[in-house]
Amino acid sequence: MLYLAGSLLFGSGSARAQDPVPLPEKEEVVVDLFARNRTVPAVYVEAVRQQVLSAFADRGRHRIADGEAPGMLAGPPAGWGFVDPATVASVQSEFLQNRMQAMQDAGARYVVTGAIADYKFEHVSLPADSKKPSRPGFRATFQVILSAYDLKLGVPVPDQVYQLRGDAPVAEDADRKALSTLYGQLEYYIDRNFKFETAILQLAPADPRKGVQELYIHSGTYMGVKPGDLFMVYEEIPVGGVITRQKVGKLRVNDVGNSTVAKCKITKGNDEIADAFLAGRGLICVSDSKALFY
């Protein structure tokens, strides 16, 4: 049992925690309006936007604001809303530029927009399965592009392009099947581009032969931390009067028992992390993505 009454139980011989540090604060992400190709029904692009809203909410790392909610910004600029593969990048960039100052003034860290830039529909032969022989069907392919801007740093988030495909005997089912494949990919997008930072609270007792293998970080369910999440560990080092960060190791979350603390296995840099922590040198943990390829 790791947790009791919201507090971490430390075994004897464990390293003493560094000075108390505040919990990470949830920053606000505004999921703004989405555009579409003229061949795409409006209900489809709203379904995509709702998946993005749900993915951010389910990840649990940010405060989420709906750009279409009452009290948010007025509607889009005149003539905005339709894109194609050739124009989507410039249209999205211009849209973000027009909206980001107002979003920043309202306290947002990020603004996210998107578009269904292309839609293709074709007849295909569906493969045979255990119940039915090969038969005619339909294939729907959507090109979805997500664009975002980091308002704090003043830089764009790299665009993410998804090709969503679905096959089904009925045309509308092919559309729905294709669109439904987006949600499962969005956690990787969020983890890659919308990171947060936290601190190491304490080292776990050292193994007599292997040294320090585990530690505790100051983030739990409140920040959406779950087993399997990864963190990179950096040491902050002054260079010529400027604070720089040097990578010293990597963590994988093994156990999350409350809202503020998680136990992690050190997967890289055991000695470096332990030495820096015990010496009181500044260490920062930055959330990382589990995706190897994307």
What label would you give each PLM region?
Residues 18-26, 151-227, 232, 256-294:
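C-terminal/domain-edge helix-coil "capping" segments
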Residues 1-11:
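Bacterial N-terminal signal peptides
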Residues 38-50, 90-93, 139, 143, ...:
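Soluble non-cytosolic domains of exported or imported proteins
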